[in-house]
Amino acid sequence: MSCRPSSVSIAVTGSSGVRVALRLLEALKGEVEIRGIILTRGAEEVARYEEGIEPEDLRRLLRSYAPLYMENDMSSPLASSSNQPDAMAIVPASMKTVGLIARGIPSSLPARAALAVLRLGRRLVVAPRETPLGVVELENMLAIARMGGIVVPLTLSFYIKPSSVEDLVDFAAGKVLDALGVKVDVYRRWRGPEEGD
């Protein structure tokens, strides 16, 4: 799929970097239809610790973007291959979710929806934020790439000359947007060393 998607779904799982998911949703709003958001309990815990957002407040915020489904809601429309969007992003992607997708185990809604997207030949973007990476984690990400998924690690970038954490968040969200095929300028793109500041 090389064209811009008209619809996307987003899964927010229990890894550091929930702020990137929130920035991604902010950038997507008004650009494409957000078919649904999947939230895990682990993501709620991370949001509480990293951002000081209580679970009920996080759910309310996410519902302002799209219908919200919890990780065990297998009755969600996103659980069915008959109702998949053009693209899906898992941001941040926990190693648990990465492992389930890589092994084809649809035991959570994020994994089930991702596997349905892949089966249909649609775009799946998986954004892990984990370090260091061992053999198991690398093999799981390789398996997803071989299945047609796009792996976008949430890494730091210094060529953008960040002046704040928000600059780094924008960069990470922008890379996910690029992989989804949704061009929204949220970060400074490389134009060569001559460009200057």
Swiss-Prot record:
Function: Flavin prenyltransferase that catalyzes the synthesis of the prenylated FMN cofactor (prenyl-FMN) for 4-hydroxy-3-polyprenylbenzoic acid decarboxylase UbiD. The prenyltransferase is metal-independent and links a dimethylallyl moiety from dimethylallyl monophosphate (DMAP) to the flavin N5 and C6 atoms of FMN.
Top-level taxon in the UniProt lineage: Archaea
Catalytic reaction(s) noted: dimethylallyl phosphate + FMNH2 = prenylated FMNH2 + phosphate
InterPro entries in the record: Flavin_trans-like, Flavoprotein, UbiX-like
Gene name per UniProt: ubiX
GO MF annotation, one: flavin prenyltransferase activity
Name used for this protein in its record: Flavin prenyltransferase UbiX
Binding positions for FMN per the UniProt entry: 14-16, 40, 94-97, 129
EC number: 2.5.1.129
Protein family per UniProt: Belongs to the UbiX/PAD1 family.
Keywords assigned by UniProt, alphabetized: Flavoprotein, FMN, Prenyltransferase, Transferase
UniProt: dimethylallyl phosphate binding residues: 159, 175
